[in-house]
Amino acid sequence: MRHRHGLRKLNRTSSHRLAMLRNMSNSLFQHELIKTTVPKAKELRKVVEPLITLAKKDTVANRRLAFARLRDRDMVTKLFTELGPRYATRPGGYTRILKFGFRQGDNAPMALVELVDRPEITEAPAEEAAE
């Protein structure tokens, strides 16, 4: 019986799935907004939310746990210096999944995954550079 097995395999081997989710987590922490398929987005949420909760308390042990999951020193630093303090008062729900239509080639349902309360990027610097 398949009771209580709450993991989507995403048609990948376990090492491929782990590497893919690690790369997607790093991309989400770096850009704070990524585009992916809906099933991958839902699995990514299960990885990212506990990491942000871990980053609320900046200890050496927590940094080591986050590094074991992310394997990227710069993203661990950003996680603990920017994202942890940003969500210190929020009790969970750090990500938002927005449906984004269907992919052209295979009609896969797409989604935007973003960190809530992310700073808005203004278009003014791009206009100044054009002038």
UniProtKB/Swiss-Prot annotation:
GO terms for biological process: translation. GO terms for molecular function: structural constituent of ribosome. InterPro entries: Ribosomal_bL17, Ribosomal_bL17_CS, Ribosomal_bL17_sf. It comes from the Bacteria. Belongs to the bacterial ribosomal protein bL17 family. GO terms for cellular component: cytosolic large ribosomal subunit. NCBIfam families: L17. This is Large ribosomal subunit protein bL17. SUPFAM superfamilies: Prokaryotic ribosomal protein L17.
